[in-house]
Amino acid sequence: MREYNLFTSESVSEGHPDKMADQISDAILDAILRQDLHARVACETLVKTGAVILAGEITTTANIDVERIVRDTVNGIGYHHSDLGFDGETCAVINMLGKQSPEIAQGVDRADPEEQGAGDQGLMFGYASNETEVLMPAPIEYAHRLMERQSELRRAGELPWLRPDAKAQITLKYDGSKPVAIDAVVLSTQHDPSISQADLQEAIMESIIKQVLPAELLHAGTRYHINPTGKFVIGGPVGDAGLTGRKIIVDTYGGMARHGGGAFSGKDPSKVDRSAAYAVRYVAKNIVAAGIADRCEVQVSYAIGVAEPTSISINTFGTNKISNDEIIRLIRTHFDLRPYGITRMLNLLQPMYQQTASFGHFGRQGSETAFTWEKIDKAEILKADAGL
């Protein structure tokens, strides 16, 4: 008898308050990296009605206008008028950023860059699956694409009543590890008070859901919940406080893979919470692209001030074509997972982080220097070395 199971993932829009905070933190990081590639940045953001509060530790020679960066970022997201409940030009900006502890610096910095220590202890996971073209789990991939479509239509003015805050959730039916049907779609979007619920639901269905989700996965039994609570006029930081790093599952694999707990945004590449998570996505994606496994989860861990990972482990969920020990050998041979090696391998000292802070960090393309961890340039080398 065939076994079916359901799996659900969610995404949120760029106007969600937590994602606002992520984008502000990464906008500040990008501005600093444009002037100082050796900066140490850990920037946290809190947004709530009428205010943006910054805190964290930064060591840099860069001279940036923090307040202007915050205002431009908020305006760029779409909160640029008091009618929306939040205005980037008039909100308070409270700057509580300080300097990084010299005790941390002495553990990280080295005369030989190759021996740069990890910025903290921790564990990170990377994942890839061949169920979608971008080698991402299908539920989170489709949820992200719904949110991207909402943003595109809002920015283009095609649905002028859309506002920045929105959420999407996809429940997929699996036959084993293969997605075979979409069981439920939830999409809630902030909107102007002028639009009726009937018109909103029709527009969301026709212009977003049907334009994004594969028709072959939709069926007569698919359930749709479009703004199921009714009105959603009050949103963004007026409706809820937003914090950097509070959407770590949205940022990664939608719960399909494990998570080490560390957030990404506002952190320079010396923080392995971010850089190593990108690196093990790169590893897992190339393993799957090489046909070595259909699904692959890679874990790596670090000790503060130590360059070499304290562990590398994998789970291929029984889909591996060679032994797991041999896959570990391939990883150690072809990927430098020391902090400096990761930065060099993925060219991470680039001001490209703000674009990662909405619609997921994985399974995407952006500017020429962004999302380098999505390349599959090692797949053929791995395949050859594996003897496949």
Curated annotation (Swiss-Prot):
Mg(2+) binds at residue 18. It comes from the Bacteria. Its EC number is 2.5.1.6. Keywords: ATP-binding, Cytoplasm, Magnesium, Metal-binding, Nucleotide-binding, One-carbon metabolism, Potassium, Transferase. K(+) binds at residue 44. Binds 2 divalent ions per subunit. Binds 1 potassium ion per subunit. Gene3D superfamilies: 3.30.300.10. Pfam families: S-AdoMet_synt_C, S-AdoMet_synt_M, S-AdoMet_synt_N. It catalyses: L-methionine + ATP + H2O = S-adenosyl-L-methionine + phosphate + diphosphate. Residues 100-110 are annotated as: Flexible loop. Belongs to the AdoMet synthase family. This is S-adenosylmethionine synthase. The lineage of its organism: Bacteria, Pseudomonadati, Pseudomonadota, Gammaproteobacteria, Moraxellales. The gene is metK.
